[in-house]
């Protein structure tokens, strides 16, 4: 993955995928954890599990959230590969505690207003009706996680994700630069003029 590896986390609708895509556009190495690493597993053991039959849509939504894990062996493998200067893992994982200490930093995207999150979820589901966040039970779960901050790293740098996307990414890169004492290296940095 990279010599320096960072996790970008946050509640659904805070902009993790948008940030990941903008970082990629700027030439950074990005791993979309929710696409490339996720599986349904036992939150305690990590063993893959089959989804049971649920009594209600709410039970199904909660179960899926609680059992959304990232493959730890894959995460460790990517972190051990130092062929990139900087890499970002973006997405939500219920087992981040199993690998968070291997990372150089964590950024937590935050949106204070739940209505903004609902609007973003509605926009996302309008583009892809199968995406998470369109059902009332999913919005209820998002509201709970937003309120309690459960399943969100508590040790990360909070990034105000109500800013325009480019400002959010600039702020993340500013923190990376400060931590490294230099400009984050990106193949497209000179072309885009972004720092």
Per-segment meaning from a language model:
Residues 18:
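Conserved Walker
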Residues 102-124:
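Conserved phosphate-donor/acceptor-positioning beta-strand/loop module used by diverse small-molecule
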Residues 21-73:
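Conserved substrate/cofactor phosphate-moiety recognition/catalytic segment
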Residues 96, 123-174, 178-195:
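Small-molecule kinase domains that catalyze NTP-dependent phosphoryl transfer to phosphate-bearing small molecules
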Residues 59-103, 110-111:
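Glycine-rich phosphate-binding loop used to anchor ATP phosphates in small-molecule kinases
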Residues 15:
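Conserved glycine(s) of the Walker
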Residues 10:
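The Walker A (P-loop) glycine that initiates the GxxxxGKT/S ATP-binding motif of P-loop NTPases
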């Amino acid at each position: 993955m990279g010599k320096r590896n960072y996790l970008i986390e946050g509640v659904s609708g805070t902009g993790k995928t948008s940030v990941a895509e903008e970082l990629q556009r700027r030439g950074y190495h990005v791993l979309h954890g929710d696409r490339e690493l996720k599986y349904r597993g036992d939150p305690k053991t990590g063993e893959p599990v089959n989804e049971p039959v649920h009594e209600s849509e709410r039970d199904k939504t909660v179960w899926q959230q609680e059992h959304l894990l990232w493959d730890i062996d894959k995460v460790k493998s990517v972190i051990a590969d130092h062929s990139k200067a900087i890499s970002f893992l973006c997405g939500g994982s219920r087992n981040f505690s199993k690998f968070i200490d291997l990372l150089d930093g964590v950024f937590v995207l935050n949106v204070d207003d739940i209505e903004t999150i609902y609007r973003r979820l509605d926009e996302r589901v309008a583009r892809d009706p199968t995406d998470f966040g369109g059902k009332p039970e999913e919005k209820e779960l998002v509201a709970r996680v937003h309120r309690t901050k459960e399943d969100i790293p508590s040790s990360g740098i909070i990034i105000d994700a109500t800013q325009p996307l480019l400002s959010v990414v600039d702020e993340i890169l500013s923190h990376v630069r400060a931590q490294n004492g230099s400009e984050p290296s990106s193949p497209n940095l000179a072309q885009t003029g972004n720092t």
